[in-house]
Amino acid sequence: MADPGAVKETVLLLDEPTGEKVSKTELKKRLKSRAKEAEKQKKAATAPTKIQKETSSEQDEANLSAHQYFEIRSNRINKLRETKNSYPYPHKFEVTNDLRDFLTVYKNLAKGEERTDVPIRIAGRIYTKRVSGNKLVFYDIRAEGVKVQVMCQAQNSTTGFEEQHEVLRRGDIVGIVGFPGRTSPKTRDNGELSIFATQVVLLSPCLHALPSEHYGFQDKEQRFRQRYLDLIINDRPRQIFRTRAKIVSYLRSYLDSRDFTEVETPMMNAIAGGATASPFVTHHNDLKRDLFMRVAPELYLKMLVVGGLERVYEIGKQFRNEGIDLTHSPEFTTCEFYQAYADYNDLMAMTEDLISSMVKHITGGYETTFESQTGQVYTINWQSPWKRIDMIPALEEACGDKFPPGDQLHTPEAGTFLKEMLKKMKVECTPPLTNARMLDKLVGEFVEDKCINPTFVTGHPQMMSPLAKAHRDTPGICERFEVFVTTKELLNAYTELNDPFDQRMRFEEQANQKAQGDDEAQMVDENFCQALEYGLPPTGGWGMGIDRLTMFLTNNYSIKEVLAFPMMKDDKADGEKKEAIVKTGTAEDGSVQL
């Protein structure tokens, strides 16, 4: 007997023209739509096939839904796939010219000048198509972020003019063979630099109707899910990813020039160590044990320094099983480096030099603008020297009370004091209320908010920094600094703890915090402790979030804008795939941009 509580499974049927599996209801709709289209084509079968008729067809396509457009276009391209002479997905097209170079080299051509002696072969995507009668078609082609007009005249065509152009639509990737020139319009003074095409080759058709340039593609949710379409329509993400690449390139160049060695360390570990964070857990079938995706590469990098690689760095992914918000992603990119015989004072000087010179190199100056989610606009001055704030004195000034000495901040009495401070200052802290978490919450409220221009925050208690070396002068404090910009953390560094006895005690304290319910506390890593027993030289360690710096230098308050493919929540659309309503625009001459 069937289970009355069971969910009835939807039966999907094959839609042969598109190769999709759809519901019975959807299939009926499509068959009916095709029957109407077939009847329309039958009536028009005797009409001569002229480019004006195709233009009318393109205008009709403006009224189609996204699915209808896809179906008609797919059918047309499938027919081309069956032919031998005009296969729409050729293996090769020889490109001899970069579009950016073309615009630079030929920008000074005179009005009406045509260089028929200069062969040009470029490729790009069609953004607009404008038809002017049977013998003239204009295209705007884009590649590598730049645009050029392509002028196609029947008199210049080396192959069938109508056959070349009637199949092309907005979004298609095409190869252009022609020569450079400047148009000679009657109503304009200078004309427009163009490629006068002798042949246009379809290299890869776009089966979907693109959003028009007029309405654009601005929905953030869809832009992140369809980053390829975002890049096709919008130029800003291209510039963001180029800036990100420049940041990574500059970091490598800077460190390589200072005799650092780039290394790679494991992404999966038996113990989640190197940072205070919640890890992702995976399982290795052959080893029959759980592994942790790394939260930081720190411990491995320091073991390499123990082995004699005195200057090492790694640029790579980290994974933290924590909340997703405007500034945090579960998968993110960092740069960490470790330098033997350096301390946190050396690293502060190096940080100022590295970041300020990088900003100057990438942006051309030391000042950038950053707009927060609330619309507050900051002007950030990256030029050194940077401001420095001592954590505990700053908290005492903000709270109006004397805090316990650094070597007493881990005690139960200090815990009681911190709870009173939270209550007095009306600050909420989520459990577990460990001393480290409460102090960190107060710092976030009253110290970090003062950091607009790049600011060093120093004087962290040892209980907040299990891998940092104790301060040489102040008990209970460690030699650590963080850099904050517009109230957000950018990087973290310290003089590394190289005392194996002290390190083991710190790990045990972290284990106690984990027992109290702090999931982010670190576990004891015996392998790392053993490595320290062989001797780690005095070392400075440094780590920076590349995503966060990219946000600052590209003026983006959301981390998803600087990630090519950010982590997204499930799309909750029910039933059939949502049909996007694609708005198409019309050119000034009345031709439809498809």
Curated annotation (Swiss-Prot):
Record-linked NCBIfam families: lysS_bact, PRK00484.1
- Which HAMAP family does the UniProt entry name for this protein? Lys_tRNA_synth_class2
Q: How does it assemble?
A: Homodimer.
Biased region (Basic and acidic residues) positions are 18-42
Q: One GO BP annotation here?
A: lysyl-tRNA aminoacylation
* UniProt KW keywords: Aminoacyl-tRNA synthetase, ATP-binding, Ligase, Nucleotide-binding, Protein biosynthesis
The entry's cellular-component GO terms read: cytosol
Any Pfam family the entry gives: tRNA_anti-codon
Q: Which family does it belong to?
A: Belongs to the class-II aminoacyl-tRNA synthetase family.
Name of the gene this protein is made from:
cla4
* A GO term for molecular function: lysine-tRNA ligase activity
EC identifiers of the protein = 6.1.1.6
Q: What does this protein do?
A: Involved in self-resistance to cladosporin since this product is an inhibitor of lysyl-tRNA synthetase. Cla4 may not be inhibited by cladosporin, thereby imparting cladosporin resistance. When cladosporin biosynthesis is switched on, transcription of cla4 will then be necessary for continued protein synthesis in C.cladosporioides.
InterPro entries xrefs: Aa-tRNA-synt_II, aa-tRNA-synth_II, aa-tRNA-synth_II/BPL/LPL, Lys-tRNA-ligase_II, Lys-tRNA-ligase_II_bac/euk, Lys-tRNA-ligase_II_N, Lys-tRNA-synth_II_C, NA-bd_OB-fold
- What residue spans carry the region label Disordered? 1-62
Reactions it catalyzes = tRNA(Lys) + L-lysine + ATP = L-lysyl-tRNA(Lys) + AMP + diphosphate
Protein name, as recorded: Lysine--tRNA ligase cla4
